[in-house]
Amino acid sequence: MAGTGSSRRTFIAGAGAAAAAGVALTGAGAAPAAAAGAGPAPGARRVVALGAGVAGLTAAHELAERGYAVTVYERRALGGKARSMDVPGSARGGRRPLPAEHGFRFIPGIYHNLPDTMRRIPFPGNAAGVWDNLVAPREMMFARAAGREDLRGPIPWPGHSPAGLTPEEIRRALAGILQTLLRLPPHETAYFVDRVLVFLTSCDERREEVWERTPWWDFVRAERMSNEYRRILAVGITRNIVATKAEEASTRTVGTLGEAFVFNVLGRGADGPPDRILDLPTNEAWIDPWEAHLRSLGVEFRIGWTVREVRYADGRVSGVGVEGPDGARQTVTADHYISALPVEHARRTWSAALRAADPMLGRCDRLETDWMTGIQFYLTERAELVHGHLNCIDSPWSLTAIQQAEHWPSRDFPADYGDGAAVDCLSVDISEWDKPGILYGKTAKQCTREEVAREVWAQLKASLNDTGRALLTDSTLHSWFLDPGVDGLGTPHPTNQDELLIHPVGTLYNRPTAGTRVPNFFLSGDYVAVDIDLATMEGANASARAAVNSLLDRDGSDAARCTVHPMYRAPELEAAKRHDRWRYRLGLRNVFDLG
């Protein structure tokens, strides 16, 4: 198996990165350089944003629009886990390098904050900016193994009048969808739909005090159901989608996500179809235009700089210790600081004095992360797969995937990328790194990079080639690329620079707010408490808006506050939730909860 994913890649770019100057280096209070377009006014308040993922870029965007001078510090590359990247050494004959990524992007219609930002990023020829680069796959598939028939179906999207939302109408609609897609025994389908109704009609207090403490496995009574029920509705929903074990995942988190998709499928409260992806590699469609727009607003970037410590003195953040590309350490100062690093990296930068100033920061140590990382397979022939996402729910490593070239209509894949031999990219997410595979009997972490690639390929074939048709063949495999954020595979100490926040029971109580007790320090990232309650790009975007609003309040600014769009609440169900609040306070079950 030819591999291009075994070498380590360091993402440090930009000729200006090696230059000195943060927002202000200690002893050198340089103002931000002028940028094309409307930059900050002389004497504008200065903000340092730590991290250039979706959270950091969103914060920079909102602040720059409000006249702040923003400098963003990023260790590797703009876009964080959302970015796409080049496969090193893969370009031939004037083509672009093969496109790769940490994991495929998924921007469902339940998102509202991120799409709003996308509409405000100009893109040539698009009236609605980057948002116009979203396309909707037509179908999805649960790919089964061991000869079981795959479950393939269209993605419901009414596109016209929304469905009714009385409990009985919801029951009928969901039962019909589940019976069509999943082929479970009717009594199990009916039971699961009733559990959905329990959650949909539960009051906020019950959700936060009971369902947050209840594992999803227990909530859906998986232990007493068939193996098919467990695989699809317990494990398949949690491990493959939110990278959390069903036996541990918070029902509030899983239920909140499920509720949003139920409303989306029924045509309620959505920005668009339930499944949307970008019509180009992520950097081409989104991150590169975003960078260009932010630079036009005067945002400055320091790429290749590592944040070492957020320092605290005299009741405020006094500066941030950073290390430049040359290894030299300096201190940058500003009026305000937004920490937009992933939680596992951010908490290492919080000094003891800073933690003492706000105990909420210490609770972030209890937040848990796990591995969910991508690998891409480049094919010399397009496989006859589903026209959308597929979920290999029987795969030991919880694989999900999508074949991408058909969704990029403005690109001729072999003419535009690589050496001309690869015609498509099958992008796969690996959500389970701690269970043995089918080839070597080892976990993904115990395998070498080459063994991971072979094992994932074998598991894909086990799910896709088991019903009489060979959809994937070894002869069509051109090469592969494994996310360079993982290192040390096959050694006693594997590492992952891009772990994902997971949601075991009780996670809600340890999520911080965007504003801290330190008046000039704010938090932004998918671990911050926002409405969606899930580690997503939407959560990162919403948290950045909340952080900016908190900063504006602390600054006494008269600038307009960012709109933070909440999750949709169906008006028809509010009466049921009020009734449930009354029952909950009396110590009674939800009216639909029959055990």
Question: Which stretches of residues belong to each language-model region?
Answer:
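Active-site-proximal substrate-binding core of FAD-dependent oxidoreductases
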Residues: 552-594
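Conserved beta-strand-loop-beta-strand element in the redox core of flavoprotein oxidoreductases
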Residues: 311-331
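Dinucleotide-binding Rossmann-like beta1-alpha1 core, especially the glycine-rich loop
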Residues: 92-191
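Active-site/ligand-binding neighborhood in enzyme catalytic cores
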Residues: 188-313
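C-terminal segments that line or cap access tunnels to active or ligand-binding sites in enzymes
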Residues: 267-278, 334-336, 341-511, 517-542, ...
